[in-house]
Structure formats: structure tokens, C-alpha cells
């Protein structure tokens, strides 16, 4: 059994970016849900602003990209032992089940760090494309609770249930990530044919009984999650190439991979009324919000959206990952919220069951910033002009204040002698203050233009981090 296989991770990461441009492009049209409970929950979700994403599976033992190294797409590369023999490699990958034992698993520790940083919802990978279930499914033995998995002997082996329960106790909204494709399942990648790419490796139209078995398998797994894991707010479905297709042809890209999402949604909402469905990139009534990946739209969108982004370079645990600096994470959150979106920030647990210590430090830095500036994030909505130069705006939903985030180029904020910007649709301001400071500011507001004089002491102070946030009360 290979304990470690080294991959060309830089190439893999770049290739995934190129792949994402084709398969993970955000939808540009939107269908408002007919169900009033779904609309209500969407409003609640939009108020959360900041969520935690976690990609975790047996692949963390090798420190490689989640699932994709067993995919035969021509953009995938792998090096090291077995790299020249796909089927031997895939067998070794699947045997990672027999050594997976994340003994340091402690979801309450994650809850404390996430809550302090201002996160309010969590989305966890119950199953990624490789098909390994991180929950106690009855549909397959390729799962964390199977006796072949060492961690199955742990009383907390059903990690999906443990994660959901721990976060729910602290009032987080709960999201179940679920991969529609399943590269372990014989009814998706049938061993009669070699897999050619990430798609189903046979034409469902030619083998309808086999495809029906896969549809039933998918339905049953989702029903398990919806019926046996407490309150779930979001069903986050990945693998957008698995969708109905009006086109026909021999190219797998044109195969009709229809899972009957209407049936899945009806069943799911019978257990979870108001459930937010995120059939990402598919567009239509089952994509209740859109999910730009690793990018921030350059302007507000007219429908609910969420940027999903990694805290480092990779979605999965990779040793020596390059974590984004705290200033980038905070300022990305500001930009997203100013444009009406949510940030779903991914932190990947390692093979031992815990996060990299750097991830905890990043969340602590965000927590420290939130202690001063959260007023401009929560209970806010976008307001024109949204941004001007390095200043980004939000408005309180109670229509009593506008917040202007002056973004710093360095971690320590050095404000200039004066700051000026336009303020739209406010006839009169009552008060202008700097969050985190008790010093009074001199300011002038005429014809929609606000000019703020910054005292010398504040200009020289570096007590503020990442942004200087002005509160404009009216």
C-alpha cells in the first residue's frame, strides 16, 4: 500500500482553474422560487453573510486534490508510483479507506473558531465525486462508518452527523454538499467500459435500467441526509455536468444525465420545508442561489449569490498550502457584502481530523476585525455607488446608517489627512464616526459630497487593521 504519492500540485491547481471555467461557470439567469418558505429562507441566508465550507475525505491522507486525481480527463496529471497505470492508481486511491483514521476530529473546536470569526452557516462535503460517503449511508460500504475504515470504531465516526449537530447547537444554518456524479458507483462509472472523462461512461439512453439504478441510489442517499441528520437548510449539489440535456450525440458531454431533480426536491422539502436547493450551474427552479467559484463578481447581482473560495490555494488538505493573508480575506468579504453576496470560505481538515494551525490564526484575525467592524457587515444591504476607489459601501437595513469601508494597502491602517466621497440619496447626515475610535471627526456634507478630516493621532495610529470603517448616521 502506498502511503504517499507526490503530485504536480501546481499544474493540477492551474488545470482545475481552466476546468472550472468550463464546468463551474456561474449561472447568469435566475428563477425566483415559487415556494414562499424557500423565499423566506433565502432572505434569512442572505443575512448570514459569511459561511464555512469544508472539503474532507480519504484523499487528505495523500494531500492531493479532492477526487480529481482519479479522473481520466486529459488535463489531470499525476506523478509518483502507479502514475503510469490508471487502474492500479485508482485501486490504491480507493484503498485509502482502509487507513483513514482522523483521531483528532473535534467539530466543537471548529465551531468556536468559526463563530468568533463571524461565520453563521456551514456547508460540509457529505460525499465528493470520488463517491466516498462521509456519513452512515446504507446504500454503499464505501463510507467512513464501514468496518474497513479504521475510524468506524470511533463513537463519532458518522462525522456528517457530528458536524451538523455541533454547528446547529450554536445556531449555524446547516448545508449538505453532495456530489451528483459518483465515480465509485458501478451505475455511473460502469466497469464494463473504461471511464473517458468526468462524465458517466455509458449512454444512459442505451442503458436506461442501469441509469435508473443510479438515479435511485442518488435519491436514496439524499433522502438519508434529509431525513436522518436533523434540520438542514441548504442542499448544495455539485457536479453541474450531471443534468438534463436536450442535445443528442456520442459525445458524453451531450448525454442526458437527468436525475429527476423535481422528484428529489419534492422529497427533500417534505423532510426539510423551505430547503434551499443549490443545483449549481444548472440554472432554473432548483438553483436557488448562484455560486461563483474563486471569484467575486465586479458588480452587484440582481439575485442571491455566494462566492465559494479557498482559504489557501486548494479545496482539500495539502501540506504546506499557501494561505491567503488575513487582509485579503477580510477585504474580500467586504467587497462581496458590498455587492450583496455571501462568502463561503473553505478550510480543509487534514488526515488527523484537524485544521492547519494557520487556519485558526486567520480566523482569529478575522474575529479581531469583526469585533470593531461587524456593524457594517451584518444587517446590511448594498447601496449605490457600491464602491469608489478603495472605499466600499453598505447600508443598514433599518435605513439609519451607511458604512464606508476604507481599504488599507497594508495590514495596519494609516488613514490620510482627509477622506472624501459621494453619498447617494441622503439629504442630511446626523453624525460621522470611525468604528473603533472615540475621537470626534470634523466633517462637511454638501451636495452629496462628504469630506472627513482625520486627526493627526488617527493618521499615525495603526491600531486598526485592514480597513478604516466610517459610520454615517442619518
Language model features by range: what are they?
Residues 21-474:
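Mature catalytic domains of secreted/periplasmic carbohydrate-active enzymes
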Residues 1-23:
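Bacterial Sec-dependent N-terminal signal peptides
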Amino acid at each position: 500500500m502506498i502511503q504517499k504519492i507526490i503530485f504536480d500540485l501546481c499544474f493540477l491547481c492551474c488545470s482545475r482553474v481552466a476546468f472550472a471555467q468550463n464546468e463551474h461557470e456561474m449561472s447568469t439567469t435566475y428563477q425566483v422560487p415559487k415556494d414562499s418558505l424557500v423565499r423566506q429562507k433565502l432572505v434569512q441566508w442572505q443575512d448570514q453573510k459569511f459561511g464555512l465550507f469544508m472539503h474532507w475525505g480519504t484523499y487528505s491522507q495523500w494531500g492531493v486534490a479532492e477526487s480529481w486525481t482519479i479522473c481520466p480527463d486529459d488535463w489531470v496529471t499525476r506523478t509518483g508510483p502507479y502514475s503510469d497505470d490508471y487502474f492500479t492508481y485508482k485501486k490504491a486511491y480507493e484503498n485509502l479507506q482502509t487507513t483513514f483514521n482522523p483521531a483528532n476530529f473535534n467539530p466543537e473546536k471548529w465551531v468556536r473558531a468559526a463563530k468568533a470569526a463571524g461565520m453563521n452557516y456551514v456547508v460540509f462535503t457529505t460525499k465528493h465525486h470520488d463517491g466516498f460517503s462521509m456519513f452512515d449511508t446504507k446504500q454503499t460500504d464505501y463510507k467512513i462508518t464501514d468496518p474497513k475504515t479504521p475510524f468506524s470504531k470511533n463513537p463519532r465516526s458518522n462525522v456528517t452527523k457530528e458536524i451538523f449537530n455541533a454547528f446547529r447547537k450554536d445556531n449555524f444554518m446547516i448545508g449538505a454538499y453532495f456530489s451528483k456524479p459518483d465515480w465509485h458507483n458501478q451505475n455511473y462509472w460502469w466497469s464494463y467500459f473504461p471511464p473517458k472523462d468526468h462524465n458517466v461512461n455509458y449512454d444512459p439512453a442505451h442503458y436506461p435500467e442501469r441509469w435508473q439504478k443510479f438515479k435511485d441510489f442518488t435519491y436514496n442517499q439524499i433522502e438519508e441526509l434529509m431525513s436522518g441528520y436533523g434540520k438542514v437548510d441548504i442542499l448544495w449539489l455539485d457536479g453541474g455536468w450531471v443534468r438534463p440535456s436536450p442535445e443528442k450525440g456520442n459525445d458524453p458531454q451531450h448525454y442526458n444525465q437527468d436525475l429527476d431533480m423535481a422528484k428529489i426536491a419534492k422529497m427533500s422539502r417534505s423532510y426539510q420545508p423551505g430547503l434551499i436547493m443549490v443545483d449549481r450551474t444548472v440554472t432554473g427552479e432548483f438553483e436557488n442561489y448562484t455560486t461563483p467559484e474563486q471569484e467575486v463578481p465586479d458588480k452587484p447581482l440582481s439575485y442571491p449569490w455566494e462566492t465559494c473560495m479557498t482559504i489557501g490555494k486548494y479545496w482539500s488538505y495539502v501540506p504546506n498550502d499557501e494561505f491567503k493573508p488575513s487582509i485579503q480575506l477580510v477585504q474580500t468579504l467586504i467587497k462581496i457584502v458590498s455587492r450583496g453576496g455571501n462568502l463561503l470560505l473553505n478550510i480543509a481538515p487534514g488526515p488527523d481530523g484537524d485544521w492547519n494551525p494557520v487556519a485558526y490564526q486567520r480566523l482569529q484575525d478575522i474575529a479581531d476585525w469583526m469585533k470593531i467592524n461587524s456593524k457594517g457587515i451584518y444587517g446590511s444591504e448594498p447601496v449605490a455607488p457600491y464602491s469608489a476607489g478603495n472605499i466600499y459601501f453598505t447600508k443598514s437595513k433599518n435605513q439609519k446608517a451607511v458604512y464606508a469601508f476604507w481599504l488599507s494597502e497594508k495590514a495596519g491602517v494609516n488613514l490620510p489627512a482627509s477622506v472624501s466621497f459621494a453619498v447617494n440619496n441622503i439629504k442630511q447626515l446626523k453624525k460621522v464616526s470611525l468604528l473603533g475610535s472615540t475621537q470626534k471627526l470634523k466633517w462637511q456634507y454638501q451636495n452629496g459630497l462628504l469630506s472627513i478630516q482625520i486627526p493627526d493621532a488617527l493618521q499615525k495610529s495603526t491600531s486598526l487593521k485592514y480597513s478604516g470603517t466610517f459610520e454615517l448616521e442619518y
